[in-house]
């Protein structure tokens, strides 16, 4: 390919990205996924923590069925408070953090949306790492057990 073609192709790609309004930082959910991977046992994947219990995954209702499900319940409420009280957008808020010595450090000024959301994710990820994963609580019948 000729250098001029590469230049035109690059310009088209840059303008398409700008038109699509794609944020320059990864979405918060990617950060949360990485935190979870860091704290859970090696034999588990972060995906096994979706559709677990009554609250791990989209939505949630009823009483959490175990300690791990309570982690998700608390996380959902933390995101809810971030939205209602602080006017943040937790699922898309980018933030800075560091994974070190089996813990997670959130950066940024206290009270900012970035720090609030990071603290929500940090608390949940550490809770996941400290909670037992019960295979029978994956993909439960939420209509039956989560009312």
Curated annotation (Swiss-Prot):
Cofactor(s) recorded in Swiss-Prot or TrEMBL: Ca(2+)
Chain sites annotated for binding Ca(2+): 55, 57, 59, 76
One of the GO BP terms on file: arachidonate secretion
SMART domains: PA2c
InterPro entries: PLipase_A2 (IPR001211), PLipase_A2_Asp_AS (IPR033112), PLipase_A2_dom (IPR016090), PLipase_A2_dom_sf (IPR036444), PLipase_A2_His_AS (IPR033113)
Presence of keyword Transit peptide: no
S-S bridge residues: 54-146, 56-72, 71-127, 78-120, 88-113, 106-118
GO cellular component, one term: extracellular region
Signal peptide span: 1-19
Keywords of the record: Calcium, Disulfide bond, Hydrolase, Lipid degradation, Lipid metabolism, Metal-binding, Neurotoxin, Presynaptic neurotoxin, Secreted, Signal, Toxin
Cofactor note: Binds 1 Ca(2+) ion.
Tissues showing expression: Expressed by the venom gland.
Localization: Secreted
Record-annotated active site: 75, 121
Enzyme class (EC, first level): hydrolase
Function: Snake venom phospholipase A2 (PLA2) that inhibits neuromuscular transmission by blocking acetylcholine release from the nerve termini. PLA2 catalyzes the calcium-dependent hydrolysis of the 2-acyl groups in 3-sn-phosphoglycerides.
Family according to the record: Belongs to the phospholipase A2 family. Group I subfamily. D49 sub-subfamily.
Assembly mode: Heterodimer; disulfide-linked. The A chains have phospholipase A2 activity and the B chains show homology with the basic protease inhibitors.
UniProt name for this protein: Basic phospholipase A2 beta-bungarotoxin A1 chain
Organism of derivation: Bungarus caeruleus
């Amino acid at each position: 390919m000729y250098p001029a073609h590469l230049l035109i192709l690059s310009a088209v790609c840059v303008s398409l990205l700008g038109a699509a309004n794609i944020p320059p930082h990864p979405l918060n959910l990617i950060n949360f996924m990485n935190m979870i991977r860091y704290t859970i046992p090696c034999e588990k994947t972060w995906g096994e923590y979706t559709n677990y219990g009554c609250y791990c995954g989209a939505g949630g209702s009823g009483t959490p069925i175990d300690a791990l499900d309570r982690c998700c319940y608390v996380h959902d409420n933390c995101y809810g408070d971030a939205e209602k009280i602080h006017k943040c957008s937790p699922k898309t808020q980018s933030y800075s953090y560091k994974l070190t010595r089996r813990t997670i450090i959130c950066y940024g000024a206290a009270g900012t949306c970035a720090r609030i959301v990071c603290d929500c994710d940090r608390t949940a990820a550490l809770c996941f790492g400290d909670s037992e994963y019960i295979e029978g609580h994956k993909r439960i019948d939420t209509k039956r057990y989560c009312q």
